[in-house]
């Protein structure tokens, strides 16, 4: 029988537990670079896991560092157990609602017209709401802490501050990083903000996003980098 998205912890990777695991059962199968289900997962010496192709990109700088813990980055080894779990764990497509093994879901959503419509409707709804009230260009370089009066953190600084000072805070808060994005909803409150930070904001959006594109181009970008968000 195929496992559901709540199998044992991945090879050497960060493990979700309690409410966080229930809220995001696919989190431990998600690459912190591309934010999609691991493809040919590789575990690096510090214990974190990346898609093989994503790791190759991360290794290109002269002094590469792990994007999760910032330790020195080096080639890793194939995460065999995690790969086995991906082969045997099922999830459903948000578009057609059919079940697929995690190892097959990336290929499926790339060709599923219902999934693409699901993504486009979400992006259009967000951009439509944002266009109703013109706003000045948001500051995407420094952010306030949503828990306390501290402010002027860069993205990495905010992640570290919240991990050190607010790791046990269970209050639902708005993510200031997401709220500054073109598609961001300034009213959406994250149920588990610390876990959200660790999974979604270990890498800067500036690396992947062109903030000046129009709506159609933005939709195409989202489709290409669509996140499987259960």
Swiss-Prot record:
E3 ubiquitin-protein ligase that promotes the ubiquitination of various substrates. In turn, participates in the regulation of many biological processes including cell cycle, apoptosis, osteoclastogenesis as well as innate or adaptive immunity. Acts as negative regulator of NF-kappa-B-dependent transcription by promoting the ubiquitination and stabilization of the NF-kappa-B inhibitor TNFAIP3. May promote the ubiquitination of TRAF6 as well. Also acts as a negative regulator of T-cell activation. InterPro entries: Di19_Zn-bd (IPR008598), RNF114_RING-HC (IPR042716), RNF_E3_ubiq-protein_ligase (IPR051438), ZF_C2HC_RNF (IPR034734), Znf-RING_euk (IPR027370), Znf_RING (IPR001841), Znf_RING/FYVE/PHD (IPR013083), Znf_RING_CS (IPR017907). Interacts with XAF1, the interaction increases XAF1 stability and proapoptotic effects, and may regulate IFN signaling. It comes from Bos taurus. GO terms for cellular component: cytosol; nucleus; plasma membrane. SMART domains: RING. Signal peptide: none annotated. Autoubiquitinated. Polyubiquitinated in the presence of E2 enzymes UBE2D1, UBE2D2 and UBE2D3, but only monoubiquitinated in the presence of UBE2E1. GO terms for biological process: cell differentiation; protein polyubiquitination; spermatogenesis; ubiquitin-dependent protein catabolic process. Pathway: Protein modification; protein ubiquitination. Pfam families: zf-Di19, zf-RING_UBOX, zf_C2HC_14. It catalyses: S-ubiquitinyl-[E2 ubiquitin-conjugating enzyme]-L-cysteine + [acceptor protein]-L-lysine = [E2 ubiquitin-conjugating enzyme]-L-cysteine + N(6)-ubiquitinyl-[acceptor protein]-L-lysine. Its EC number is 2.3.2.27. The lineage of its organism: Eukaryota, Metazoa, Chordata, Craniata, Vertebrata. The modification N6-acetyllysine is found at residues 104, 114. Zn(2+) binds at residues 93, 96, 108, 112. This is E3 ubiquitin-protein ligase RNF114. GO terms for molecular function: ubiquitin protein ligase activity; zinc ion binding. A zinc finger (RING-type) spans 31-70. It is found in: Cytoplasm; Nucleus. The keyword 4Fe-4S does not apply. It is an enzyme of class 2 (transferase).
């Amino acid at each position: 029988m195929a496992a559901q998205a709540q199998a044992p912890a991945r090879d050497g990777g960060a493990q979700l537990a309690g409410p966080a695991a229930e809220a995001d059962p696919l989190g431990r199968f998600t690459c912190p670079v591309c934010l999609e289900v691991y493809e040919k997962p590789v575990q690096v010496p510090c214990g974190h896991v990346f898609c093989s192709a994503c790791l190759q990109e991360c290794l290109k700088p002269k002094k590469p560092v792990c994007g999760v813990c910032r330790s020195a980055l080096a080639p890793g080894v194939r995460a065999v157990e995690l790969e086995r779990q991906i082969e045997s764990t099922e999830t459903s497509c948000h578009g057609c609602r059919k079940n697929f093994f995690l190892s097959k879901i990336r290929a499926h959503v790339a060709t599923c017209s219902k999934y693409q419509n699901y993504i486009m409707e979400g992006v259009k709804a967000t951009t439509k709401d944002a266009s109703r009230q013109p706003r000045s260009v948001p500051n995407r370089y420094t952010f306030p802490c949503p828990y306390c009066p501290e402010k002027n953190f860069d993205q990495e600084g905010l992640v570290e501050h919240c991990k050190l000072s607010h790791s046990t805070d269970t209050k639902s808060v708005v993510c200031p990083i997401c709220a500054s994005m073109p598609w961001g909803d300034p009213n959406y409150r994250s149920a588990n903000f610390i876990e959200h930070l660790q999974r979604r904001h270990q890498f800067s959006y500036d690396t992947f996003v062109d903030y000046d594109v129009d709506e159609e181009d933005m939709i195409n970008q989202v489709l290409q980098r669509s996140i499987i968000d259960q």
